[in-house]
Structure formats: structure tokens, C-alpha cells
Amino acid sequence: MEGTAESQTPDLRDVEGKVGRKIPEGLLRGLRGECELGTSGDVLLPGAPSTGHGLGDKIMALRMELAYLRAIDVKILQQLVTLNEGIEAVRWLLEERGTLTSHCSSLTSSQYSLTGGSPGRSRRGSWDSLPDTSSTDRLDSVSIGSFLDTVTPRELDEQGLPGPSCPEIDWAKVIPTEDRARTEVDMTSTKLGSLTATWKLPGDGLQCGPPEPSEDGNANQGFEAHWYWGQCQDDVTFL
């Protein structure tokens, strides 16, 4: 039996000579066991222990499997490290892009707020910030005569109250020469008419005394004053 097993074992001397090392006994025993299993016609059950393998062979097989698993673990770890580096690179790119996008959006929003919402109005932004002068134009269009009309009644009411005398206006500079002469003649005739109405001769039985103003004279004076004021107002408006 032993002779048949040794004869079926392959000759490994050439391999030992080329490698320079002796073939391990475990490998030889494994080869011998395979040969015995191939020659014997006995069928072993899956759970039954093999007769040709000892405890040392099982330990060696377990060590080889552990080394193989460790090599696989090392490869998996290397792949995981490479994958982690790629993920970190992509994450950094996304963060930088988000930062640049937010910065650009903030700059764009500030530019739009300064330009008033449209790039075309950027050149006119300074002009839009200037105050509106339309109100001053409206004030300039108001005539001086209407302004005097609003101020005159209040001033006339205040003339009856005691207070400092108002400065007199040099009407000679305001009223033209012809109108001024006509106004003086009319006022002189009005005064003469009032004096004629109040003063009478001594033969009429009336005592001479200071003239008393009549109602007609007061009405005429009021009319003349009103006409005089209207003429002045027209002249000022014309100027």
C-alpha cells in the first residue's frame, strides 16, 4: 500500500533543486492524501473527518486562509481610502462653488439695489437721487398779485391795532409817471370836493369850524384807496 502511494506521489526533486528549498511535509502529506483518496473507492461524508489530515494540517490551512483574508482586507481598506479622498475632493469643490455663488449673488443683489433694479439705470442713479424740482417750479409760477391778495386783508386788519408803524412804500418808483399824476389829480379833486361840502359861507348861519368828514367823502376815499391799491398790485404783477 505504501509502495503504491509513494509511486503515485509526483517527483518534486527538480522543483526543490530549482527553488533551493525542501518541499514542506504538509504539502507532501496533502498530495499523498489526494492520491489515496483518488485510488480508494471509499466515499467520505461531508461532516466526517478525513483520515489523511491531522491537526497541524488544519491549523496550517486556517493560517493560510487568515493571511488570504488579511490581504483582502488590506485591498478593501486601500480602496476605501481612495474613495474617501475622492469624496473629500468633491465636497471641497462643492463648498468652494457654493461660497463663490453666494458671494457673487450678494454682489449682484447689492449692484441691483444701487442701480434701482435694472443695469440700464446705473448711469442715471445719481440723477434719480436728486430732489424733485417740480414743486419749486409750481411755486415760481404763482403770481405776486395773488400772493399780495392773500396777505393784504390780514395786514389791513392789523392796521387798526396799536403797534409800530409800517414802513411806507415809495410809490413813485412803482407807479408809472402818467398813472401817478392822474392819481394825484383825482385825490386832490376828492379832497377839494369834501372841503366844499363841509365848509359854507358865514351868511348861511353855520359856524366855521373844522371840517367833518361826510359819508360820501369816506366812500370816495375808500374807493380811491381801493383803486390805488389795485393799480399798485397790477404794476407789481407786471414787474
Swiss-Prot record:
Oligomer and partners: Forms a tripartite complex with CDC42BPA/CDC42BPB and MYO18A acting as an adapter connecting both. Its binding to CDC42BPA/CDC42BPB results in their activation by abolition of their negative autoregulation. Interacts with CDC42BPA and CDC42BPB.
Function: Acts as an activator of the canonical NF-kappa-B pathway and drive the production of pro-inflammatory cytokines. Promotes the antigen (Ag)-presenting and priming function of dendritic cells via the canonical NF-kappa-B pathway. In concert with MYO18A and CDC42BPA/CDC42BPB, is involved in modulating lamellar actomyosin retrograde flow that is crucial to cell protrusion and migration. Activates CDC42BPA/CDC42BPB and targets it to actomyosin through its interaction with MYO18A, leading to MYL9/MLC2 phosphorylation and MYH9/MYH10-dependent actomyosin assembly in the lamella.
Chief subcellular location: cytoplasm
Name of this chain's protein: Leucine rich adaptor protein 1
PTM remark: Phosphorylated.
LRR repeat start-end pairs: 55-83, 93-114
Region listing for Disordered, in residue ranges: 105-138
Sites bearing Phosphoserine, chain numbering: 118, 126, 129
GO biological processes: positive regulation of canonical NF-kappaB signal transduction; positive regulation of cytokine production
One Pfam family linked to the record: LURAP
Compositional bias annotation for Low complexity: 105-116
Keyword Chaperone: no
Entry keyword set: Cytoplasm, Leucine-rich repeat, Phosphoprotein, Repeat
Cellular localization per UniProt: Cytoplasm
UniProt entry tagged with the keyword Repeat: yes
Record InterPro entries: LURA1/LRA25 (IPR039499), LURAP1 (IPR037443)
Entry GO CC: cytoplasm; cytosol; intracellular membrane-bounded organelle
